[in-house]
Amino acid sequence: MDEFHRYGKEDSSWQQCFLYPLFFQEDLYAISHDHYLDGSSSSESMEHFSSNDQFSFLTVKRLIGQIRQQNHSIVLFLNCDSNPLVDRNKSSYSESVLEGLTLVLEVPFSIRSKYSVEGMNEWKSFRSIHSIFPFLEEKFPHSNYILDTRIPYSIHPEILVRTFRRWIRDAPSLHPLRSVLYKYRNSPENFKRSIIVAPRVNTRFLLFLWNHYVYECESILVPLLKQSFHPRSSSHGSFPERTHFDRKIKNIIRISRRNSLKSIWSLKDPRIHYVRYGERSIIAIKGTHLLVKKCRYHLLIFWQCYFHLWSEPYRVCSHQLSKNCSSFLGYFLRVRMKSLLVRTKMLDELFITDLITDEFYPIVPIVPIIGLLAREKFCDISGRPISKLYWTSLTDDDILDRFDRIWKNLFHYYSGSFGRDGLYRIKYILSLSCAKTLACKHKSTIRVVRKELGPELFKKSFSKEREFDFPAFSSKAAARSQRERIWHSDIPQINPLANSWQKIQDLKSENGKLNLFDQ
């Protein structure tokens, strides 16, 4: 792979004769088959795979022979199963071929994304949920509007092939891709005659299509936004929030003048803030109400011009930071003004300056989370805890571990937000629901369960020290968390309860059918 990267950096003409021969390498399909089994075993139970699903090099050779005969749809579908992208448990041969196709296309894509991102003025596309938390900590001294955008994920297969054709000169390597996409588009389960690419799918092939599609969108959209909202630089001799800027030293540039020994500090003063996770993105900009309407209109035109698809107007919503609140990844996002008093003394006079900046104020949606707990049978509609009858067949340790993981993951996800006192109401619901579940299992009361199992049992599972990941400084972290916002780094993805609530909010906005110029 290092040699591929070296060739790609020196000369991109190697792509003209490199990709297509990889389809005839038997080892590639063996590797892809191992990747397929590893991914399937992690996401699906092994009971779905029978002993007859064995990998045969003889079948692979036949598939390669049919690829040489240009019968791509026969290779990928007819000899394996009728619809491999929908029912992937019927046979693993089609998935192995798709994995091999994905491995071949990932080689130039990884090289292109690596070197093109380096040349985009240090712009990096956010790929992890951990990149959301610095965005929530950012200051917005100039932005007064946000655009909440949901990237459309229904796209025509030929548009995807054309996006690949822009940077892959090896045209024969795209024939299998075109066959796969059109076969999937013509499947009976697909009524829209388009490809659904989204980050929530599990197949590696569709995930690769999604990453490529989003990369193409951002590589075109981000430079346009940066040209429209050009950042300015302001020079300062000293900063009132020097501690805050030192923690974000990468945004400060030291400029030395040639004819002077003095040096000044130039702070990047951006007029645009952008963050994306999955199909949701937020753009914070500065402008008038008319300018925001135009920007919203151009975003909708962008999908039509570059990808020939119609994006519904409700997928791009605009909100004024000082008046409205929005939902993003399970948080209520509001903006509050933060004032800072600066005292400046000049000779015998003392000046007091009040600097006001805007910052995000993420709030925990307590009431919606309690409603989701009621839907999952942890409590009733009023928030009164009830027993989880489906878990009474489990052991006591499994029941305690499940309730503890729900609480710990929920607390860690909202650890850096405001209004965390309401989380302890959710803790009370979960702990009492756990006690009632154990009492229902042993056919006794909560008092008897506490007496038999001991009071230390619930303290071990729902202890306050387990809410923090600082073993040596747990007491200090607990005291500091009441004053500061601490984001935990063990959050792999959006919390399931928060994700369910976010989907409900998206459905409400979709059913509302917001007009293009309503906001």
UniProtKB/Swiss-Prot annotation:
Key words of the record: Chloroplast, mRNA processing, Plastid, RNA-binding, tRNA processing
Subcellular location: Plastid, Chloroplast
Biological process terms in GO annotation: mRNA processing; RNA splicing; tRNA processing
Broad class of the protein's primary localization: plastid
Keyword Protease: no
GO MF, one annotated term: RNA binding
One annotated Gene Ontology cellular component of this protein: chloroplast
UniProt key word tRNA processing: yes
Matching InterPro entries: Domain_X (IPR024937), Maturase_MatK (IPR002866), Maturase_MatK_N (IPR024942)
Functional note: Usually encoded in the trnK tRNA gene intron. Probably assists in splicing its own and other chloroplast group II introns.
PANTHER family cross-referenced by the UniProt entry: MATURASE K (PTHR34811:SF1)
Similarity-based family: Belongs to the intron maturase 2 family. MatK subfamily.
Protein name per UniProt: Maturase K
